């Protein structure tokens, strides 16, 4: 009887652990500007978030991006309105702020997080076109 209880407890524990793993991102994927370009080109409804300031975003940004600044106090409140079950792509100027944003998104339960390596500067150096 003790063994049966122990086995049942292990099965229940494994069930809850496996469910937890499916609800949050396993890792944040650092991807190249070319990979972001391909994703944006193939899906104009992509959750693409520029985490720079409003002023930086106003100077230039990727065509379909929305601006949610990671240093604003309401960052979590704003990103909470996005779909946690859909892939989300983030970028900033050089990659530091988007890395921080990606970590926050992971903590909030986003399942598929992509961080553009090198940020907007890297995008520009690659001569990619999907800019505003």
Predicted feature locations:
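Structural scaffold elements adjacent to functional motifs in cytosolic proteins
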Residues: 48-50
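Rhodanese-like catalytic fold shared by cysteine-dependent sulfurtransferases
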Residues: 2-9, 16-39, 45-46, 55-87, ...
């Amino acid at each position: 009887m003790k063994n049966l209880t122990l086995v049942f407890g292990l099965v229940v524990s494994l069930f809850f652990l496996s469910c937890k793993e499916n609800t949050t991102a396993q890792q944040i994927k650092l991807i190249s500007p070319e990979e972001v370009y391909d994703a944006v080109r193939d899906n104009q409804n992509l959750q693409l978030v520029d985490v720079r300031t409003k002023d930086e975003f106003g100077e230039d940004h990727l065509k379909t991006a929305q601006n949610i600044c990671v240093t604003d106090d309401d960052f979590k409140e704003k990103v909470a309105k996005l779909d946690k079950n859909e892939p989300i792509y983030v970028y900033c100027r050089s990659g530091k702020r988007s890395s921080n944003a990606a970590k926050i998104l992971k903590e909030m339960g986003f399942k598929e997080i992509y961080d553009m390596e090198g940020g907007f500067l890297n995008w520009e150096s690659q001569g990619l076109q999907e800019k505003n």
